[in-house]
């Protein structure tokens, strides 16, 4: 299983790169990489905005995680769908892929383990936090071709809305609160 972290965005609503924000002593990007490696053998990070700073975080972590790599998304401004499509193409087509975002500070290793415990070769496993569906999402290799032409602002939400029969929802009691606007920084103490 390969982890795919979507971390290419410019964080325009926040006003600064959320990948670089520090929470509990780690950048949100480092935190996401460590979460992914708690269940994945390799991890690919999609980069776009703030490439130099994010690459330095990745290079530091490659000493600990040699199977950590990154891909620069040429058209990252187009949206999450672009990162998802390009990122998936860099991963062996036989691999299941766990897709994560780097702006979800409430995620834990336990969430990751619960998600992969439901792995199903024919269905995506979608996390839901108090009714809000969100990555992490486990995409089995059999469903990866459905994302071949994903582009622009097509996030994963479109997938589970259009393909409910191909998805299994795992419900968590945690409140969904990502880091998108300055008030979220305050909430998380970042």
Regions found by a protein language model. Give the residues of each.
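Short, well-ordered alpha-helical scaffold segment located
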Residues: 111, 142-143, 175, 184
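Conserved nucleotide-sugar donor-binding
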Residues: 134-145, 182
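Short, glycine/charged-rich beta-strand-loop motifs at protein surfaces that mediate ligand recognition
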Residues: 102, 143-150
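Phosphate- and divalent-cation-binding pockets in alpha/beta enzyme and binding domains
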Residues: 13, 53-57, 146, 178, ...
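N-terminal/domain-start segments enriched in small and hydrophobic, helix-friendly residues
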Residues: 15, 30, 144-147, 183-189
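Conserved alpha/beta core of the MobA/IspD/sugar-nucleotide pyrophosphorylase nucleotidyltransferase superfamily
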Residues: 149-190
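A residue-level structural signature of the nucleotidyltransferase/glycosyltransferase Rossmann-like core
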Residues: 104, 135-138, 148, 176-177
């Amino acid at each position: 299983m390969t982890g795919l972290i979507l971390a290419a965005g410019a964080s325009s609503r926040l006003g600064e790169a959320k990948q670089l924000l520090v929470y509990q002593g780690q950048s949100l990007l480092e935190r996401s990489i460590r979460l992914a490696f708690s269940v994945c053998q390799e991890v690919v990070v999609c980069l776009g905005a703030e490439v130099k700073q994010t690459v330095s975080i990745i290079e530091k972590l490659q000493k600990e995680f040699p199977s950590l790599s990154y891909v620069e998304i040429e058209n990252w401004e187009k949206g999450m769908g672009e990162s998802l499509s390009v990122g998936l193409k860099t991963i062996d087509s036989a691999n299941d892929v766990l897709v994560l975002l780097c702006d979800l500070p409430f995620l834990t290793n336990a969430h990751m383990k619960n998600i992969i415990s439901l792995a199903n070769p024919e269905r995506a496993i979608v996390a839901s936090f108090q009714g809000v569906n969100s990555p992490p999402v486990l995409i089995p290799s059999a469903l990866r071709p459905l994302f071949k032409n994903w582009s622009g602002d097509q996030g994963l939400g479109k997938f589970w809305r259009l393909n409910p029969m191909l998805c299994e929802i795992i419900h968590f009691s945690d409140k969904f609160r990502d880091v998108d606007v300055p008030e979220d920084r305050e909430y998380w103490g970042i």
